[in-house]
């Protein structure tokens, strides 16, 4: 695989910001590690993980923040669905891709081989929570739980920004970055 180093920075566990270059892979899945050089010409390549840094930014492209979050394991592709709702999860330190930075909340995504998940960090809290979207089968038919709609409505109510127009758009929202933004 060819290298594609772009200008960026990493934030260490002690909060130090180190400028350099990150091998930008235009990831389809959230990266578990990145390659970082302080100097583009003859810099030593460091492999950094969620254990060693809290954030990395590829300038003009993407920012990823490390968070320890529950990651739902329930499948959403029809061929993989089961009769029972899969509520299993694991807790892991992962790099969440920052999609929106707001005054009150930030929106993140996490994609792996199973599915995409969206997370909200309510700035009154310290940990993001997953916006819940589940699928299962019932008598061979697909059943979808759109719990993320109630989660978004509740958050808007707590902040006093809920109105008829907002509720209307939430009631039609699909589990996609475009709608959840």
Residue spans for each PLM region:
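Compositionally biased alpha-helical segments
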Residues: 1-180
